[in-house]
């Protein structure tokens, strides 16, 4: 099999070292039995991300074909659910896919965020699990479910309110930091967008791609009980994480 590993990045300098270390280890594992290509797309960073990615991509390129696009589009760095934000992210994901080799070469396309912590061997389980779209689940530094907007159990939901999964769960949509997609829908024209084709409303880009897959007959979407963690970002999360580390030492 051949895998395309994709990462989009913007102002993630603080997370690049762990991103590289994990991705490098995962690539080594995959290369034992498969072909791998890596695609990285960055735009409009102002914190040193551009140079950091250049350094790490040069190292990854010694393992397999690796493409980096670093550009300045002049887009604002938005937060929340704004239509411009999800459109920017969707465009970045599409560019990341399209700058790689011909899509016809790949069996699976895997998106891996820069700001997640995971065990490479567990990521392998996600990547190899049979399904049209497969993910684990994300938690924040306090152990709470993280990717609640993108993850939905039914078409009527707009937010995940089902707690932490303890078993494989069929879902309407998912992403959760590491998400493996069958390449066939992309070969047939599926792309990310900020507009949900079923509701014609602004929606999470990674929810939208699940809707697009479903619309063309790829509806096997699952979330596995594999924890992908986000490091602490707020003061409250940092204090909680520090307290937990102290308790583990006792």
What residue ranges belong to the model's regions?
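Short, well-formed alpha-helical segments that are part of the catalytic scaffolds
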Residues: 12-28
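Short beta-strand/loop segment that forms part of the nucleotide-sugar
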Residues: 34-44, 69-71
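Acidic helix N-cap motif at the loop->helix transition within catalytic regions
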Residues: 15, 47-56
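C-terminal catalytic/acceptor-binding lobe
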Residues: 166-250
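Hydrophobic targeting segments
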Residues: 2-7, 23, 36-40
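Active-site-proximal specificity loops/subdomain of glycosyltransferases
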Residues: 52, 56-104
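Conserved catalytic core of nucleotide-sugar-dependent glycosyltransferases
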Residues: 116-194
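Short beta-strand-to-loop acidic/aromatic patch adjacent to the donor-nucleotide binding site
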Residues: 98, 104-117
């Amino acid at each position: 099999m051949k895998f395309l590993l994709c990462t989009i990045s913007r102002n993630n300098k603080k997370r690049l070292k762990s991103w590289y270390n994990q991705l490098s280890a995962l690539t080594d594992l995959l290369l034992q039995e498969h072909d791998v290509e890596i695609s990285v797309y960055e735009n409009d960073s102002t914190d040193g991300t551009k140079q950091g990615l250049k350094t790490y991509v040069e190292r990854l390129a010694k393992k397999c074909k690796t493409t980096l696009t670093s550009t300045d589009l002049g887009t604002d760095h938005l937060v929340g659910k704004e239509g411009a934000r999800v459109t920017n992210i969707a465009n970045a994901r599409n560019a990341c896919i399209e700058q790689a080799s011909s899509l016809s070469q790949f069996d699976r396309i895997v998106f891996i965020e820069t700001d997640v912590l995971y065990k490479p061997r567990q990521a392998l389980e996600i990547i190899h699990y049979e399904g049209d779209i497969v993910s684990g689940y994300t938690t924040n530094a306090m152990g709470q479910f993280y990717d609640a907007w993108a993850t939905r159990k039914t078409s009527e939901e707009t937010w995940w309110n089902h707690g932490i999964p303890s078993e494989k769960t069929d879902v309407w949509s998912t992403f959760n930091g590491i998400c493996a997609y069958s390449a066939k829908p992309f070969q047939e024209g599926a792309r990310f967008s900020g507009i949900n084709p079923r509701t014609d409303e602004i929606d999470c880009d990674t929810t939208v791609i699940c809707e697009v897959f479903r619309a063309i007959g790829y509806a096997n979407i699952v979330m596995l009980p594999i924890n992908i963690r986000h490091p602490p970002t707020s003061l409250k999360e940092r204090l909680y994480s520090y307290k937990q580390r102290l308790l583990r030492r006792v």
